[in-house]
Amino acid sequence: MRHYIDRDVSLNELKPCNFSDNDQFLNFTNRLDRRHWYSIGAGFLQRYYDNPFSEFDLDIFYLRLKINKKIKKVGTIAFQMDRGTAKNISFQKTAVSSDFDRSYETIEWYVPVKLKSFISLFDHVGFSFRQELRYYKAEAANDILHSGRDHTDSKLSFWVDKELWDDLSVIVSARFRSRNTDSAYEWVRDLKSFNQTQLWCKIKWGFSYDKY
């Protein structure tokens, strides 16, 4: 009698897909004039998954350009563009499923707006729109899930903040997300497309510690 652990993919049992991000970013900022400034940067993001999803491990290299504008007595607005390449570092190195290449190219643009609130209940209000276009590199005919697939991921966010005391503030946010997937297979389009609403509250507490 031998004891085995069933490692096969199950259609009924779901597994948590946990991952960690380690983002390293180098940025240069310079002023254009009194109300305009820009930033240029490059980053390296390591996105590694826990078992049994380690075949999705990615090293992501990206470049970023951001232009900011201050509007007198109103607030600020910015435009940001990212261009990145994700390399599937576990491709053909772990389980059988790692024979499928999850590498992709990505382009993302982002427009955040921050305004002074005209309601005394809040200090600032803001909104932003972010859209990512992702193109998978997979060409294997047997990798139906990724081959020839791309998607557009759009996020519309709103937020308000309020400083309660000098060292305590609250931010309440809402985000509406929509992903539209394009594939030659209808079931892939249905599986990887979704709409999502997120609500959250962030409490920020700042303090200083001096030791003489």
Segments from the language model and where they lie:
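Gram-negative and organellar
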Residues: 1-212
